[in-house]
A protein has these predicted regions:
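Short hydrophobic alpha-helices that are characteristic scaffold elements of the AMP-binding
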Residues: 1-6, 27-28, 154, 166-167
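ATP-dependent adenylate-forming carboxylate-activation enzymes
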Residues: 8-27, 38-40, 170-190, 199-201
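Conserved AMP-binding
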Residues: 14, 149-154
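Adenylate-forming
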Residues: 36-45, 150, 178-179, 192-213
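Conserved pre-ATP/AMP-binding loop-to-beta segment of ANL
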Residues: 75-94, 100-101, 131, 136-145
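Conserved AMP-binding A3 loop
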Residues: 90-129
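Conserved AMP-binding/adenylation subdomain of ANL enzymes
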Residues: 113-145, 153-194, 208
Length: 213
């Protein structure tokens, strides 16, 4: 959100990818700044030693700034208001590459907003077809909480779950990767009410003996 807010283009890369895939994404997008953890940053430094970076778990070096140091700074800088057109690029997502090299798909500001509206429209349709059950859920004292169990570099994780929950101020719990025991623990302890994922994930959850408890 902060990246887009200053008029830049966000490029979520496959953090599980190998060095070659990261290199392709950085080169194709002509990235000028990278946010990464130490594991990914070690790959990136082998490819581009001088690319400016900010890291959550690395110290300061010639071209890397620790995020902790940025957050500790006493001086607050007001974000510059940048005029953007609705058709200006906002996010560059990469395909999975199952049929060849991953390909970049540019999403404009309008595309992103329309995608969020589509999710809300589907939600409204779901409510209208299941009003009695949905009203029971809405009457629950437990507020809506979502478990994010898919990657943010995938469109369903970023737009359909992360940004839609941010838009409505709902709690979002993020998993590093899918693990059935960890998912059940989070659902139980945090009283999660929403989980969206691949069919195999949902089936694994429903078949687990702990889920009924």
């Amino acid at each position: 959100v902060a990246i887009v807010n200053v008029g830049a283009v966000a490029v979520p890369l496959n953090s599980w990818g190998k060095a070659q895939e990261l290199q392709q994404g950085l080169e194709d997008s002509e990235a000028s700044l990278v946010f990464a953890d130490e594991a990914r940053l070690s790959f990136i430094r082998e490819l581009n030693a001088s690319l400016p970076a900010a890291s959550a778990d690395s110290g300061n070096t010639n071209h890397t700034t620790a995020l902790a140091d940025i957050l500790k700074r006493d001086t607050a800088v007001a974000a510059e208001v940048v005029a953007v057109d609705r058709h200006d690029p906002a996010i560059l997502m990469f395909t999975s590459g199952t049929s060849g090299r991953p390909k970049g798909a540019m999403l404009s500001h309008f595309n992103c907003c329309q995608a969020l509206m589509n999710v809300e429209f589907i939600g409204a349709g779901t409510y209208m077809t299941n009003m009695e059950e949905m009203n029971q859920q809405l009457a629950s004292p437990i507020p809506p909480k979502t478990l994010l169990a898919v990657p943010l570099f995938h469109i369903s994780g970023l737009l359909s779950q992360a940004l839609i929950n941010l838009r409505h101020g709902r709690a979002l719990f993020m998993m590093y990767k899918w693990d059935i025991d960890e998912a059940i623990r989070i659902i139980r302890d945090e009283k999660v009410t929403v989980l969206m994922g691949a069919p195999v994930m949902l089936l694994e959850l429903l078949k687990n003996e702990q889920f009924g408890d």
